[in-house]
Amino acid sequence: MPSPSRKSRSRSRSRSKSPKRSPAKKARKTPKKPRAAGGAKKPTTLSMIVAAITAMKNRKGSSVQAIRKYILANNKGINTSHLGSAMKLAFAKGLKSGVLVRPKTSAGASGATGSFRVGKAPASPKKAKKAKSPKKKSSKKSKNKSNNAKAKKSPKKKADSNGIRYQAYRYRRPRGGARYPFRYQAYRYRRPRGGPGTQFAL
């Protein structure tokens, strides 16, 4: 029978001889490709329909089948399974906004049937011009009129606290002499206590 000390030694040797497990390698992440900045946006279904109708130049309008063929031939990466439903929505939107119009031959058609034409672009509303404020006229004429009206009025007498009255007189040369404009001269009147009024020139 082997001793317990030998068994413990053999176990320690077997543990020491066992190979060490290598740590699991981390999976490398593949770098994501950056998206191209400013890439061209895909055209809308309505814009593709308008381009197809204008390119075909049919006066009586272009049929839905012809428009579909043109879109598939001139646009890459289009999902054909979703194109039919997208065209129906685009036709309804175009008729509502006035971008697309039905000719007389297919006036009774509805939905994505019949033929279509490009409608006239709605005119952009012009901005209303601001009304110019009228310029204020110089008030020189009004001032001159008011001054002339004041001159024509008869002069008023003004009483002073001392009982002195002032009155303006105008003088003009006689008819035989030289003509001069009216001259205005102010006079002061004062009535003495016991006698007639005396005149004093200012």
UniProtKB/Swiss-Prot annotation:
Family annotation (CDD domains): H15
Gene Ontology MF terms: DNA binding
Expressed in which tissues: Sperm.
Any Pfam family: Linker_histone
Domain H15: from-to ranges: 41-120
Cellular component annotations (GO), alphabetically ordered: nucleosome; nucleus
GO BP terms in the entry: cell differentiation; chromosome condensation; nucleosome assembly; spermatogenesis
Annotated SMART domains: H15
Segments for region (Disordered): 1-46, 104-202
Biased composition (Basic residues): 1-35, 126-156
Compositional bias (Low complexity): 177-187
Keywords from the UniProt entry: Chromosome, Developmental protein, Differentiation, DNA condensation, DNA-binding, Nucleosome core, Nucleus, Spermatogenesis
Superkingdom of the source species: Eukaryota
Posttranslational mods: OE1 and OE3 are produced by post-translational cleavage of a common precursor.
Compartments where located: Nucleus; Chromosome
Role noted for this protein: Linker histones are implicated in chromatin remodeling and/or transcriptional regulation during spermiogenesis, the process of spermatid maturation into spermatozoa. Protamines substitute for histones in the chromatin of sperm during the haploid phase of spermatogenesis. They compact sperm DNA into a highly condensed, stable and inactive complex.
Name of the protein this chain belongs to: Sperm-specific H1/protamine-like protein type 1
Organism per entry: Ostrea edulis (Native oyster)
